[in-house]
Structure formats: structure tokens, C-alpha cells
Amino acid sequence: MTTAALGLALRAAGHNFKIAIVHFMKIWDYGEVKTLKRLGIDLFRYGTTELIDPENPSPVDFEQAKLAMEKAEELVREGAYDIVILDEITVAIGFNLISLQGVVDLLENKPDNLELILTGRTCPEALIERADLVSRIDEIKHPYQKGLQARKGIEF
């Protein structure tokens, strides 16, 4: 998930790694965005301020996901980064905004010296099979379950 990927980015930034993050479906002004910019981590953010209807994504949702995927392919191809994080990309696959095969191709053609990190709530088996490391963070209990709103500095 995003939290673990950002922890890795923080650690790598401490060792002067060059890091890029492509946010699929995330353009809100989260607190971590401000910190990442201060650390010199390059952010490429795509999406809208509207929630996506997984059953009926809008044409804008498809266009934004396409642009995010094109940026991901460019970053991997150019090889200028040590780490590229594709945040919420597996959710974009699950919503059928981008093709699973396109992400598989990206994994199979990445340079050996690039750490390519994918995040999202679900992960297709085809990606798990090709990954070197797979982690799962399961929500057991959350304040949302009590109807509490997201809190500045905690959830965003």
C-alpha cells in the first residue's frame, strides 16, 4: 500500500536515491505530497477530484489513467531514476482503466537496476508471479467504521 511505499521512498531519499512517484487517481493535496516535494522526490499526479465509480468510470478517468501509464512507461524507459513507485496502479487495473498486460510488459521490460514498486488494494496473480517482493497490509480496524471523518495529518 501507499504507506509502505512512502516509507521505502523516505529511506531511499536518505541515501540520495533518485525517486519518482506516479499517482494513479490521486490529485488531492495530501500531507505527504508536501513532504515528498521537500525531499526532492518527483511527483506525477493524475486523476480528478471526483471519486471513481468502479462500475462506470468516466471518459476523464480513462484519459487520466492513460496519461499516468504513459508517464510510468516513460520513466521506466528513460532509466533516470533508482526507484519508480506506481501508486494505486493495481486499483486502476481493477477498475479496468488500464490493461493488466501493459503493466506486465512494464515489469518484464524494466531495467535490472530499477526498483519498480506497485501499490493498490488488490494485486492480480500475474503481477504477484513476476514480483520479487509482495506485501499485504490488511485493515483490521479503522475509525471510518465508527463514522469518523478523515483527519488532517493522520489519514491525509
Model regions and ranges:
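Conserved P-loop
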Residues: M1-R77
